[in-house]
Amino acid sequence: MQGLLKAIRGSQSTEQWRACGALILCALAFSLMTVCVKHLGGQLPVAEIVLVRSLISIVITLAMLQRVGVSPWGEQRGLLLVRGVLGTTALLCFFEALARLPLAAATLLQYTYPTLTALSAWLLLGEPIRRRIGIAVLLGWIGVMLVMQPDWIISTTGAVMPELPAIAVTLGLGGALLTALAYVSVRQLSAREHPLVIVFYFPLVSVPATLPLLWGQAIWPSPEQWLWLVGVGVFTQLGQIWLTEGLSALPAARATSINYVQVVFASL
C-alpha cells in the first residue's frame, strides 16, 4: 500500500491519475485471475489453461479492435512479437509455480517483479530510479511479507521450515523476471502502438506456443472447470488492458510499484 500511496502522490496530471486508477483495477483483475488459476491447479495442464485464456483474449481483442477501426498488426512487429514471447513464457512459469507452490509462496516470488522492472527500465530505457520509488518498492516488499506471512520462511517456534522445491522456486523467479521484461517492452511500445494492438500480440504468440505442449496431454474440461477457465480469460484480458493503459502514462518503476496493491486483494 505504501508503494501505491507514493505513486499516487507523484502523479500530477489527470492522465497520470487515470493511469493509477487503471493499474489498481489491473491489480484487482489479476488477483481474481490468480484465484481462478489456483482453483484449476492440478486439474488441467498449465498449457491448456494458457491456451484457453489466449483464445478468449484473441476473440475479445479482435472484436474491440474492429470496433475502434484499428489494424491488429501494429508498426513495431518485431518488438510486439518479443513482448508476446516474454508474456507467454512468464505466464507459463507463473501458472506452473501456482500449481506447485502454496499461494503465499508463489505470490511472494512473483512480487519480485516490481524491483526487477525498475532495474530493467533503468538499464534498457534509461528511466531513473528515483528515491521515492526505491523507498516505495522497499516498503512494498515489507508489506508483502506482512500481508502474506509465508509460513515457509520461519515457523512459529523460529525453526526454518523445509525448503521449497527448487524447480518451482526457479519457475516463480523466472516468471517474475520475464514479467518485468514484458512490462518494460509494453512501456516502450506504448509510445507508438495502440494499447489493444499490444494486448493482441500476447495471445497471438501464446496460442501456437502452447498447442505443441498439449500433444497427448489435453483434458476436456468439466462444466465447472469451463467457468473457471472463462474467468481466467476474462480477468486476464481486463488486467492486460488496464496494465497497458497504466504503463502508457507512467514510468515502469512507478507503475509496477502500484501493483503491490494486488497483494492486499489476494489476502482478502
Regions found by a protein language model. Give the residues of each.
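Transmembrane alpha-helices of multi-pass small-molecule transport proteins
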Residues: 2, 18-19, 43-89, 178-182, ...
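Transmembrane alpha-helical segments that form core, pore/gating elements
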Residues: 35, 61, 154-218
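Helix-helix packing/entry segments at the starts of transmembrane helices
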Residues: 52, 106-112, 189-205, 240-268
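Loop-to-transmembrane-helix transition segments
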Residues: 16-26, 69-95, 166-175, 220-238
